[in-house]
């Protein structure tokens, strides 16, 4: 088995009306927990790492882990660069083997965003690497960056059409009312806006900020054309909460084989639920 481009996964999802879950990873345990469930449920998966992830553990180490686990679990997977902001950083990581990258220029004006994304697309497509970009801007906290509500804005459908045409991007992350992190109240998702974007944009659409969004809302976005669903915060909360509870019950405990497994098992339940919500189970042949 191998690490592949997300475009092959997303093309199948778009053709068959489901979404591929993209789970953020941080170390060997998070990769293993996610793939244990994906292997069992035969779900395609995208493992995503932010620049902050690769400050914690080198890309080359993450890549080696993903390659090994792909063989262990006999399934293809995509390793994805999430929320990267420079061509130089992406270029280095693509040369190291990655075949999926998100270039995030959403904080730039439209024309600057287009210019940056187009430069990344031109390079990545020469390396069989798919490219995701974002138009519109989500609020909340992602990695080390915080975007307040006043700076967030939703994706304009006609701008989305122009953006895809000008850049040649493979998938588009849209801002329709979700945010990174948790919500203080139920998010207001602009389903009509999503439907209008889907009418004029042919490439796969991506939902960022799916943690803590009601399952029925996520399912509705998939019905309207979302083919990649990003999940990060819920995984971390489940893992950390279970480990904290274990230490509360075992204050003298010190063996990572036990407390890490508790965290992994809690994370696995989140993964299992998201696969069911995305409708991605049994999409990989045995």
Swiss-Prot record:
Q: Which residues form a coiled coil?
A: none
Which sites bind Zn(2+)? 83, 180, 208
Name the GO cellular-component terms. cytosol
Q: Which GO terms describe its biological process?
A: carbohydrate metabolic process; D-tagatose 6-phosphate catabolic process
Recorded GO MF terms? tagatose-bisphosphate aldolase activity; zinc ion binding
Q: What UniProt keywords are attached to this protein's entry? A: Lyase, Metal-binding, Zinc
InterPro entries referenced in this protein's UniProt entry, alphabetically: Aldolase_TIM, Class_II_FBP_aldolase, FBA_II, TagBP_ald_KbaY, TagBP_ald_KbaY/GatY
Gene3D superfamilies documented for this protein = Aldolase class I (3.20.20.70)
* Annotated pathway: Carbohydrate metabolism; D-tagatose 6-phosphate degradation; D-glyceraldehyde 3-phosphate and glycerone phosphate from D-tagatose 6-phosphate: step 2/2
EC primary class: lyase
**Family according to the record:** Belongs to the class II fructose-bisphosphate aldolase family. TagBP aldolase KbaY subfamily.
Q: How does it assemble?
A: Homotetramer. Forms a complex with KbaZ.
NCBIfam families (UniProt xref): cbbA, PRK09195.1, PRK12737.1, PRK12738.1, tag_bisphos_ald
Q: What is the name listed in the Swiss-Prot or TrEMBL entry for this protein? A: D-tagatose-1,6-bisphosphate aldolase subunit KbaY
Its ancestry begins with: Bacteria, Pseudomonadati, Pseudomonadota, Gammaproteobacteria, Enterobacterales
């Amino acid at each position: 088995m191998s690490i592949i481009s997300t475009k092959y996964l997303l093309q199948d999802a778009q053709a068959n009306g489901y979404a591929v879950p993209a789970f953020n990873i941080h170390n060997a345990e998070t990769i293993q927990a996610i793939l244990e469930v994906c292997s069992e449920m035969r779900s395609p998966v995208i493992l995503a790492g932010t620049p902050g992830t690769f400050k914690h553990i080198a890309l080359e180490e993450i890549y080696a882990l993903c390659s090994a686990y792909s063989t262990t679990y006999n399934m293809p997977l995509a390793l994805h660069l999430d929320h990267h902001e420079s061509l130089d950083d992406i270029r280095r990581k693509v040369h190291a083997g990655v075949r999926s990258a998100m270039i995030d220029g959403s904080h730039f004006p439209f024309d600057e965003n287009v210019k940056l994304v187009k430069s990344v697309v031109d390079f990545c497509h020469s390396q069989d690497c798919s490219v995701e970009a974002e138009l519109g801007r989500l609020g909340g906290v992602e990695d080390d960056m915080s975007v307040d509500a006043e700076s967030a804005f939703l994706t304009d459908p006609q701008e989305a059409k122009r953006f895809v045409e000008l850049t040649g991007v493979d998938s588009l992350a849209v801002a329709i009312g979700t945010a990174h992190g948790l919500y203080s109240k139920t998010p207001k998702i602009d389903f009509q806006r999503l439907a209008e974007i889907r009418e004029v944009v042919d490439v796969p659409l991506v939902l960022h900020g799916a943690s803590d969004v009601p399952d029925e809302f996520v399912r509705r976005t998939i019905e309207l054309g979302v083919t990649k669903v990003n999940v990060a915060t819920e995984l971390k909360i489940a893992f950390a909460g279970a480990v904290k509870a274990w230490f509360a019950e075992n204050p003298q405990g010190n063996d990572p084989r036990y407390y890490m497994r508790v965290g992994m098992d809690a994370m696995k339940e989140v993964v299992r639920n998201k696969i069911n919500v995305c409708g991605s189970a049994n999409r990989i042949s045995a």
